[in-house]
Amino acid sequence: MEITTTLIIIIFTAIVSFTAFSNEKIMNDLIFYPPAVQRGQWYRFFTCGLLHADMGHLAFNMITLYFFGGGVEQNFSILFGKYGKLIYLAMYVLALAFCLLPTYGKNKDNYHYRSLGASGAVSAVVFSSI
């Protein structure tokens, strides 16, 4: 089995999610929380994609990424040559943040709002495969 960028994303996301399932501090430090972003914690636009609400949420996102990501990654390598994997990774990471911009605008003062999951980035990969 080849170690692909997609597989690395899946493994890293699973490790962080499993760790956060049993560690509330990690969950609170990485989750997307708009008031914390307003205090300069911009990393939360990205780190929330490493967290999932439960095993089903994690499994659905990572299985979907596995089935669609490999093809997109391969096509990016064909289209962009040696930069294909880097562009694929950049698309995934930037999609994490981009999909949260409307949410941030709507909830920037909402102290009760939190968000997590990689669904926005996984959706970007799925749409890229079309």
Residue ranges: model-predicted function:
Residues 1-130:
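A detector for small-residue-rich transmembrane helices and their helix-helix packing motifs
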